[in-house]
Amino acid sequence: MIYSIIICAGALLGLWILEKLLAPKDTRPPLPPGPWRKPIIGNLTDFPPKGTPEWLFWAKHQERYGPMSSLEVMGQTIIMINDAQLGIEIMHKKSALSQMIPDAPFAHMAGWGMSLATERNRQAWKTIRANMKQEIGTRRAISTFHPKMEIGIRRFLLRTLDNPDDLRFHIRKEANAFMMDVAYGYTIAPHGKDELYDLTQQSVRQFSHIFSPGEWSVNFFPILRYVPSWFPGASFQIKAAEYKRTIERMTMVPYLWIKDQVARGCSRPSILLRLLQKGHYESGSHQEQVLVWTNAEFVMGGSDTTVSAVSSFFVAMALYPEVQRKAREELDRVVGPTTLATFEHRSQLPFIDALVKEVFRWHPASPLGAPHITQEDQIWDGYLLPKGALLLPNIWTFTHDPSVYHDPMVFKPERFLEGKDSPPETDPMKFVFGFGRRICPGRFVTDEKLFLIACHAVSCFFISPKDPGAPEPDWLPGVISQPGAFDLNVVPRSPAHEELIRSIETDHPWKNADATDISRFMARNQMI
């Protein structure tokens, strides 16, 4: 056996040497600088170790190689973009030259082939994007959902008041409750088990694992998709099958449930219902899958970025009490000490608006942006970006560049306000949600929800660390990153504020949840 391995390795090395000797001389400009390429495998061993925050690992490339760096793995060129202005020039202003979506064999195996992150059928991709833009892609479109947002955020305050130690759970539940209501007309259970909510959470967790850069060997060696699951090293086949079962249920259960409601004459307004009524969708057709995935993208994409941003906001308020005090003073002065702000107040609250921008800058929800693929050779600053190269923007380095942001590690909303001697620093909204035609379609949902949660939380609560000497938490690795464990005290400012929070119970009593109905539907259709 060992001799066979040695012979194979020797043959591969010989072929590699022969290819180098016989290959015609390349007269094109060089690739951007990067670590030395090893024979055959290239930079396969130069990826971040498991559990390492990828954006911090790749930030070292900026220190060593400058605004652009490159790697190669099995013939695939990867260009790391470490400079915001360069990212805007290449992936936004010239987005037509790099709008293709990278191939992701594992994602397709895991049932995520229709996701915006992987769908390579241009017409399907455009349809999903167009549907999302129409429903949530502009501030005008989002304004139709303001009443739902306001009610949901007030319920979030109530849950936090009653059980502040479960703050992270409340943040996630509020974000998902809103998206599931908008997308499906679904009311989650305020307390207790909810199978559709649990299924959505499971899908979101799996999403981060599926799309984690460098995680799956089959993405580098696509031929491995044909290896049986029992073969040594092919455990990814088992994971792919598990994830596929989850996402198929998560996408199809609410769709079939709404179709059942329509048949029974008891459907409620939702994005999915509006799209369903616009056309006829054959069961099992590609058009049906486009419809189903449009709403899955609404729910999963919109909720997880919001959870990340809101979690980072609470950590920032605890670590920077002076910022919290200034925000509260502005709200008390403009809105009143025992009145809750609305979206109409935003133009009168410049410090809160700057605070929202600083949350996005301080720790972007997606520290590594969505990758793009070049569609033709491009030359930038004397370096070649070859056709088919994967462009990977390190958003974290964009937002922590000391030449753009003074004291970038410090949470300082004032950087976005007009100063007596200094103009506002660059608005991070230009790049934290992506570039060009791959920009996050749900960015306005996250922005507006963070604004109102910041207003209400600062108005009603004092936020502080349980351990006054606790350092800033680590941020967890993943496609969508969130702060690690960090215990907070969240207490009402006064009895009057507690009464204000509890007024939601009489203003908008809890609605009957759909959890029991969906559980029965799933059991009846053998979808559990």
UniProtKB/Swiss-Prot annotation:
Its EC number is 1.14.14.117. Pathway: Mycotoxin biosynthesis; aflatoxin biosynthesis. It comes from the Eukaryota. Heme binds at residue 440. GO terms for molecular function: aflatoxin B synthase activity; heme binding; iron ion binding. InterPro entries: Cyt_P450, Cyt_P450_CS, Cyt_P450_E_grp-I, Cyt_P450_sf, Cytochrome_P450_fung. It holds the Pfam family p450. Keywords: Heme, Iron, Metal-binding, Monooxygenase, Oxidoreductase. Disulfide bonds: none annotated. Changing residue 517 to H: In strain: ATCC 96044 / SRRC 1273 / AF13. Its cofactor is heme. It catalyses: 8-O-methylsterigmatocystin + 2 reduced [NADPH--hemoprotein reductase] + 2 O2 = aflatoxin B1 + methanol + 2 oxidized [NADPH--hemoprotein reductase] + CO2 + H2O + 2 H(+); 8-O-methyldihydrosterigmatocystin + 2 reduced [NADPH--hemoprotein reductase] + 2 O2 = aflatoxin B2 + methanol + 2 oxidized [NADPH--hemoprotein reductase] + CO2 + H2O + 2 H(+). Belongs to the cytochrome P450 family. Converts O-methylsterigmatocystin (OMST) to aflatoxin B1 and converts dihydro-O-methylsterigmatocystin (DHOMST) to aflatoxin B2 in the aflatoxin biosynthesis pathway. PANTHER family: P450, PUTATIVE (EUROFUNG)-RELATED, P450, PUTATIVE (EUROFUNG)-RELATED-RELATED. This is O-methylsterigmatocystin oxidoreductase. It comes from Aspergillus flavus. The lineage of its organism: Eukaryota, Fungi, Dikarya, Ascomycota, Pezizomycotina.
